[in-house]
Amino acid sequence: MLNAIVDGLWREGDKSLAVRLVAETGDALPAWQPGAHIDVHLPCGVVRQYSLTGACGDESYLICVGREAASRGGSRYVHETLRPGQRLSISAPRNLFPLHQAERVLLLAAGIGITPLYAMALQLKATGTPFTLHYYVRNRENAAFARELSQCGDCIIHTTTPRTTLAEHFPAPEAGLHAWVCGPAGFMEKARDVAAAKGWNDAHIHSEAFQPAPPVTSGVAGEIFTVKLASTGERWPVPADKTIAQVLQENGVDVPLSCEMGICGACLTPVIDGVVDHRDSVQSEAEKSAADQQVALCCSRSHSGELVIAL
């Protein structure tokens, strides 16, 4: 864990708050690359993940937090209570959404999904890689980093709904063209549908969710399964109204939780035996169907009566 100080706060558009963090020691914070995020332990008792944004060569960290009407505590605290000079505990950066080398890049962002893609745009500009960024917001006043994006190259802010215009902005597939998509689950589902209709290779589409996908109901309502620890043989029932993580914590098992929505990957745990009912948004379909699978303890369940995990 790293100790950081809030070095600055400012508005980015009318719904987002930028937060600059510096190391309490005055040293440079650990290096990162576009697509990385950190866990922020807020004084209100919640842990939230925020994408790092801005220039990745800076010694400080920049995050941008959207104001959520249905906040579970994180965005409300940041917008209403956080102040310059406050001390926060943060994790080292993790990157589940890296920017790979490509001949050309398409960036598609909706809402606060702009945060990792703004960092990618700066990196692509610095390396001379051709790119186009389409950024969808409800109105111009909602846009974060609007001034910076206007100076960053081919960055276009749209106030039209992506449901009706995304197909116009999605080019035909090319061998060296890759797309990075970030925003609400519905936006990314639409982007993937458009890409599939145009013949894109799924391996050329890279995405990160800022909201969990809608829950998928499977099996019998109220079905109970058993989770078993491979290391000790201990097993406990997981009722329909509790997650695997909650059951493990109730029985004294340390679980690395962060988002608790299946969008960060912090609680992914290898599966030894059993059939996972995947409900996370962080793993690809290929990862969810691979021989060596992982289960998101915060949200996923089991199709089999028992799930044996590597804990």
Regions found by a protein language model. Give the residues of each.
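Ferredoxin-reductase
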Residues: M1-R87, S91, V137-R140
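A short, compositionally biased
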Residues: W32-G35, S218-F225, I263
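Residue-level marker of beta-strand positions
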Residues: H37, Q86-S89, E250, A266, ...
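FNR/FR-type flavoprotein reductase catalytic core
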Residues: R76-A230, P237
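Local cysteine-cluster metal-coordination motifs and their immediate loop/turn environment
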Residues: P116, V253-S281, S289-S304
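Short flanking/linker segments adjacent to small metal-binding domains or redox-active Cys/His motifs
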Residues: T160-R163, P239, S300-L311
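N-terminal pre-ligand scaffold of iron-sulfur
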Residues: V220-L257
